[in-house]
Amino acid sequence: MRLHYRRRFNFLRRILFILCITSLYLSRDSLKLHAKNVLMDHNVAEYHGGMIDDIQILRCYHWYRQCSSLYAPKLHPSNTAKKIKDKNSILWTRVSKNITVETLYSLQSGPFYNSYLYVHLKDFQSNPKNTIKELAIARDSALIPLQVLRDINKLVKSSDSSVFHNHVYLREKPTSSWWKLLFGISVDTDNIAVFGEEWVYKGSGIWCKYILNDDDNDAPITNLEIYLGSSFIESRPSWKEVIHEFHRNNIPSLPISITRKLETKNHHHKFSNGLLGSLRTPSKDINIQVDADYKITSPHIQFSRGQRSFKILQITDFHFKCTDNSMTVINEIKTVNFIDRVLASENPDLVVITGDLLDSHNTIDYQTCIMKVVQPMISNKIPYAISLGVSDESNLATSAQIRDFIRNLPYTFNNVASEEGHMAIEVSFKKKLTKNTLLERDIDTEDETNPSEALFFVFDSFAPVNNFLQDYNDLIGKIDFGLAFQYFPLSEYRPHGLFPIIGQYNERSTLTVDTPRSRGQVSMTINGKHYKSFLDILSLWNIKGVSCGHEHNNDCCLQSKNEMWLCYGGSAGIGLPRIQGIYPTVRLFNLDDILDEITSWKRNSNLVDEVYDYQYIYKGKQ
């Protein structure tokens, strides 16, 4: 009996050994890939831009050394499975998302892996042939995106097209499904047939169009970005969403939006800001230098024709979180709509954002939150400048990453900010006018005097200003008037005794802000003279007023000792804690070169179409 069991055991052991050897042989390609990814260099960078010739959703297993890049086979579309076999693996780079928790933007997950979006960079970046020029992603891999169906419908109407050819796209299945669950690379093994030759199926619901020859004038895709959260809207020129708010069924987290950018020609040009369509004021013609990606390249704004005034909208304190909380999402949508309505009513020439776009550690995706804030300005081609606040930080990103993202946005003056984050925006009117010219219809261009100059400082509250201001000594005595903006209030915002005030002044406690300017500790020597007052320093450039954010329950303007008005921008975020009777508010300034005056007023979300607290910030002696 014992011999009988021993023989049976030896037989089973041989069978098991044969099965193991067979399984290892069949999965040898997958094992090689896994070994390659386990041992690969961890310093390989993620995808931050460049032309691509392939894109896939790939699994990154927990035992891989890193997920920034990995080796995987390339998918080849064909009519038969035999033609798509590719034993050689290529290096794929993951589409970058500058947050530290990788699982937040994984497209799928399993007990042993997370799936991400990967691309293959084209070898020769100078030649766009065989690169991807358009991209569409379906919410379900068994469905075809609407954009693809629309293009197919166009081809159906053409009897001489190749639409009647049946093309099947397959992915090789070298191993069994249970073994691939552990060791496979690909996520999707669909076989999908589509009529037409333009769109190519890449698996996992991804469809691509390629530049097939040198005569194709379409621009290639040069960048991809991922955004987390609801109510995201892509408004940047040359960018387009390829999938909007994709909800990952097996991951209880925020929806994902993926956007793509097309190549732009490398040249500089000018743009004239203003609202689109019938809302745009025809008399406005403001020239601002921007590059091919509409990033501002010069801090100088020049007026042409008869424009004689300059309007600034100050918005501050949004505290966007971009979480999955429904009330938070609704309030953020309402806030963006509020800003949209103000822009439609006022059509400002410049928007200054004085901090707290984010809500510190409560914010998940800082990029989505910032894009929500600036979307109204980008859509309306209105330039803007951002001064960061104390809440503009995130547990998932560094301060440098946040600032770098803002600098690369279109229409922002942050691209020309100093190393410390300060900005000086110069505005030149075509010529200096007086009240007498109000009655003149035609002005002789030969009698023009020097242009009128205005200057707007946008300071970073956390950085020193001494070196920055020294760079603008040559403008002292040449500026007609100007304004300064920053996030924190100055020490002069807490005056003693009686003082003029217009608006709500509810937070009057001692400033707890720990910056030299807010403590009144300023020391600077300019042109041989020593100054200890920041307001006295600003007056050298004829700055007539300062405006800040930070305090949600203050929206007033109060007058300082040297007759300079110190203002608050209110707080724009709907749903923020405020005392009763205080609504989300924005402040506007208008500089009139003819009347030689600066005026200010406010609008709030309760009565957007009405203005209130209209006042003079500066009134000349003409």
Curated annotation (Swiss-Prot):
<dbReference type="GO" id="GO:1902600">
    <property type="term" value="P:proton transmembrane transport"/>
</dbReference>
<dbReference type="GO" id="GO:0004721">
    <property type="term" value="F:phosphoprotein phosphatase activity"/>
</dbReference>
<dbReference type="InterPro" id="IPR029052">
    <property type="entry name" value="Metallo-depent_PP-like"/>
</dbReference>
<comment type="function">
    <text>Involved in the activation of the plasma membrane proton-ATPase (PMA1) by glucose.</text>
</comment>
<dbReference type="InterPro" id="IPR004843">
    <property type="entry name" value="Calcineurin-like_PHP_ApaH"/>
</dbReference>
<protein>
    <recommendedName>
        <fullName>Protein SIA1</fullName>
    </recommendedName>
</protein>
<dbReference type="Pfam" id="PF00149">
    <property type="entry name" value="Metallophos"/>
</dbReference>
<feature type="signal peptide">
    <location>
        <begin position="1"/>
        <end position="27"/>
    </location>
</feature>
<keyword id="KW-0732">Signal</keyword>
